[in-house]
Amino acid sequence: MRFAGKVWRLLVGIKDGLVLVFMLLFFSALFAVLTARPSPASVRDGALLLALDGAIVEERTEVDPFAALLSGQAPMGEYQARDLVHALDKAAEDDRIDAVVLDLDRFVGGGQVHLQEVGEALDRVRAAQKPVLTYATAYTDDSMLLAAHASEVWVNPLGGAVVAGPGGERLYYAGLLDKLKVNARVYKVGEYKSAVEPYNSTGMSEPARENARALYATLWEEYRANMKKARPGADIERVTTQPVEWVTAARGDLATAALQAGLVDKLGSRADFEKRVVELVGDDEWGEGPNAYPHTTLATWLSDNPLPTKGKSIGVITVAGEIVDGDAGPGVAGGDRIAALLDEALDNDLAGLVVRVDSPGGSVLASEVIREAILRQKARKIPVAVSMANVAASGGYWVSTPADRIFAEPETITGSIGIFAVVPTFEETAAMIGVTTDGVRTTPLSGQPDFIGGFTPEADAMMQAFIENGYEDFLSRVGAARGMTRDQVDAVGQGRVWDGGTARQLR
C-alpha cells in the first residue's frame, strides 16, 4: 500500500506538472498573439493619416465638458497649425512613413495663412519623394487650397469641387432696430470702421465697400497665385470666371468638371481611394475592412515626435481669438490670463519672446493689459518679435506695438486702427408699450447710463470724447512703435484694414 501511494502521488505530480506546463504554454501563446497586434498608440510603418475632422486653428479652444454634455453636440475638432507643420516635417525625414494621407471629408477650413503653412509642409514631404494623397466627397475653397499641394487628389464621383473666392454679404439690423424702436447709439473714430454699420445702416458705406474690395482683391490674387503654384495644370481662371459654362460642359457633373479642370486627379469611392493607398504602403493584416492599410494617427505621431528642447529657451505666447477682459481662454484671448502667463515667464532665462497674434481685436482694456505685460518682458532687454497669423487687427495690432520686429504673411489681415462702441437704449421701445421715465437730477450725469430712459446729451458727448481719446492713444502707441508721426498713422488708420503685403509698404 505504501508503494501504491507513492506511485499515486507521482502520477498526481506528473499531472499537475503537465497542467502547469500547458497553462504556461497557453498564456505565452496568448501573450504573443496579443503583443503581435499593433497598439493604436504606437507608430507603424506605413502612412501618416491626417483625418482633419474640423478646423485648423492657431490655438485650440478650451472645451467645457459640462456645457458640451448639456448641448448634446460634440465640439468641433481643432488642429493647431504648428502641430500639423511639425508632424509633416518629421514625416518627411522618417523612414517609417511611406506616404501622407489627408482625409478632408469633414474639413471645415483654417484661413489662408494657416493653409499655406501646412501646404508648404506638404510640399516638403513630396520633395522627400513621399506621395501625399487627399480624399473628400467635395472640396471648397479652403480644402481645395490644401489639397492642391497633394500628389494625388481624389474626389467622390457624386461630389465635386467648387472655388468661390472671398466675399459675400452680411446682415444689417438697422431696419429691425427701427421697427423695435431700439436706439443703437454708435460711438466711433474711423471712416472705415465698418463693424458698427449693421446697427446704424441698411447697407455698406462707400468707404467700407472700397476697403473690402481692395482687401478681397489682394487675398483673392494670393489664393489664385498659391493655387497655380501648387497645381500648375488647374484651370482656375475658367472655374472662377465661367462657372456655369464650366459645369455645363460636364453636363452638370461637378466631379467630372473638377477632373477636366485639373482641380482633382482621380474620381473614386472611399474604397477605391483606400485600395490606392494599399498599393503604396501595403495592406494591414490587423486592420478592419477589406482595404485597411497600416497607418499612424496625428496624435500618436506627435507623441512620438515631441518638440525639441535643446538650446536656450525662446518664449512663445499666443494671442488668439477675441480679446476679452478676464481669464478666458485658450481659444479666446483673456487679457488677465495672457498677462499672467507673460509675468510667470519673467523668472525664466529667455533668449527672446515671440508673440503669435491671430486676433481681430476686442476689449481696449484687455489689449492694454497684454501690451503692458509684453513691455515688462521687453524691459529685460530681450528681443521681442510679433508673428501675425490670419488676422492681427484692431486690438490684435494694439498688442503688437511693443515688438522690435513684426512679421506678417501676404494674406494676413491687419491694421483696423480705430475704436468704436455700440450701446443700445430702449426709451422709444418702452414708450411704445406705455412705459415712461421721469425723475430729478442733481447733475447732467445723474442716473446715467440709463438704458430705458436714454442718455443725456452730456453722457452722449462724454462717450464720444472717451472713444476719441482712445483713438489718439492708439495713434500714439503705433507712432512710437513704428517711428511715424500722429498724422502718418492717422492717414493709414481710420479703421482701415490692410493685407500684410500692403501693410509692409505703408508709411
Pin down the residues of each PLM region.
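Small-residue-centered hinge/linker elements
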Residues: 1-252, 274, 278-481
